[in-house]
Amino acid sequence: MGNRTKEDELYREMCRVVGKVVLEMRDLGQEPKHIVIAGVLRTALANKRIQRSELEKQAMETVINALVK
C-alpha cells in the first residue's frame, strides 16, 4: 500500500464507512443526521453474523465515538 500510515488507512476506512451509511440512508429517504448515522453504525457493528476486518471495526468505533461527542 505504499507509504500510507495506519492513521491514513483508518481515516480512509472511516470515510468509506460513513459514505456508505449516508448513501444507504438517502436511498431509504432518511435524513442523515449524525446521531442516526452513529445508531446505524452501532447496529451494524453489533451484528456478529457479518465478518469485518479489524480496520473496519476500528473505523466504525472511531466514527461512532466522534459523532456522539
UniProtKB/Swiss-Prot annotation:
UniProt-listed Enzyme Commission number(s): 4.2.1.2
Matches recorded under InterPro entries: FumD
Recorded phenotype for the gene knockout or disruption = Cells grow to slightly higher density than wild-type in sublethal levels of streptomycin.
Keywords attached to this entry:
Lyase
For this protein, what is any one GO molecular function term? fumarate hydratase activity
Pfam families cross-referenced by the UniProt entry: DUF2767
Described purpose of this protein according to its UniProt entry? In vitro catalyzes the addition of water to fumarate, forming malate. Cannot catalyze the reverse reaction. Cannot use the cis-isomer maleate as substrate.
**Family in the record:** Belongs to the FumD family.
What is the protein name given in its UniProt record? Fumarase D
Provenance organism: Escherichia coli (strain K12)
